[in-house]
Amino acid sequence: MAGSRTNDIKVYCSFCGKSQDDVKKIIAGNNVFICNECVALSQEIIKEELAEKVLADLTEVPKPKELLDVLNQYVVGQDRAKRALSVAVYNHYKRVSFTESRDDDDVDLQKSNILMIGPTGSGKTFLAQTLAKSLNVPFAIADATSLTEAGYVGEDVENILLKLIQAADYNVERAERGIIYVDEIDKIAKKGENVSITRDVSGEGVQQALLKIIEGTVASVPPQGGRKHPNQEMIQIDTKNILFIVGGAFDGIEEIVKQRLGEKVIGFGQNSRKIDDNASYMQEIISEDIQKFGLIPEFIGRLPVVAALEQLNTSDLIRILTEPRNALVKQYQALLSYDGVELEFDKAALEAIATKAIERKTGARGLRSIIEETMLDIMFEIPSQEDVTKVRITKAAVEGKSKPVLETA
């Protein structure tokens, strides 16, 4: 029961001793009373303790080698990118820990947000997810193509922050130490190097809007998402310690690199540098190339760490299918084991799955759908066939020319 009187008897707060006449409201419980002032004080104490806990959780930041070891357990290949990410993430959270305890005269450490460049299915999103999971920090994913600048139909950039707050169970202090991955960042590049006289709703304007939250600001976020409205209650979140990782395929950027290095698409330059393939050109990318592609200089400047990922080949995809701790083959073997059935993939079948993924240009993200297509009928029938003890997936089964081989007791 809440109120200021109980049977016309004056009541007092059990914590501070103030009477009902000295405070706005007293809440009555089971033989105990608490005033609105003590409730507010309790909330403040809890908030401070939660903030201290969040900071304490980040004081022991895994070292770059430890982060790399975690990535190696789940991510195949991309060794150079994994090293760059491990160092950048370590430095970021050391900076967060340092900033919280620094004196005014100490060096001001800048954020090291990350730009990942690599083809579809090369593992950009999965790398970011794995890092966040290993650090036990909130993680949110956003698609840059869904964003528009304020005043236009679409999603405000502040809604990215809402996703992170939701991932932190609305614990703002914890969200302020989280990681946000923005995918398809190349899709909001300016159309050409010259600024258009028409309004670029999902291009440079979105880059400018993202720039503010990436570099660090106190943003007002609508708790239910959507557009902001007058008199709407907002969640205030400081983005200065949020790590932003942005990624995109940047199709065609290798041609920009070739031109900068002096190697023409047609003919040969006398001073050209010869590099074997496009994958190697990706490792040569500098900020000048990214700017020429269409990202504005201010935006590039807030992404000092650039990690280039390579196109995955057949061998890489086969390793992804079989080697990581959560490899897809292991997952499907576990699924069938619950029905008492052993699952085996022929080597040729794994090669066929990898080849299909490359042909579809889906990379690693397309592997699961190919296995699902191959095993749909098997997973439907096996639970009802108690005499089946083993399923063998062949190359012909992957190619749709025959059914998987069944062995019975």
Curated annotation (Swiss-Prot):
Pfam families (UniProt xref): AAA_2, ClpB_D2-small, zf-C4_ClpX
Keyword Glycoprotein: no
Gene3D superfamilies per UniProt: 1.10.8.60, ClpX chaperone, C4-type zinc finger domain, P-loop containing nucleotide triphosphate hydrolases
Binding locations of ATP: 119-126
Subunit record text: Component of the ClpX-ClpP complex. Forms a hexameric ring that, in the presence of ATP, binds to fourteen ClpP subunits assembled into a disk-like structure with a central cavity, resembling the structure of eukaryotic proteasomes.
GO-annotated cellular components: HslUV protease complex
GO biological process: cell division; proteolysis involved in protein catabolic process
HAMAP family: ClpX (MF_00175)
Ranges of residues in domain ClpX-type ZB: 1-54
Positions contributing to Zn(2+) binding: 13, 16, 35, 38
Top-level division of the source organism's lineage: Bacteria
Gene: clpX
Function: ATP-dependent specificity component of the Clp protease. It directs the protease to specific substrates. Can perform chaperone functions in the absence of ClpP.
Keywords annotated in UniProt: ATP-binding, Chaperone, Metal-binding, Nucleotide-binding, Zinc
Molecular-function annotations in GO: ATP binding; ATP hydrolysis activity; ATP-dependent protein folding chaperone; protein dimerization activity; unfolded protein binding; zinc ion binding
Family: Belongs to the ClpX chaperone family.
Protein name: ATP-dependent Clp protease ATP-binding subunit ClpX
Keyword Chaperone in record: yes
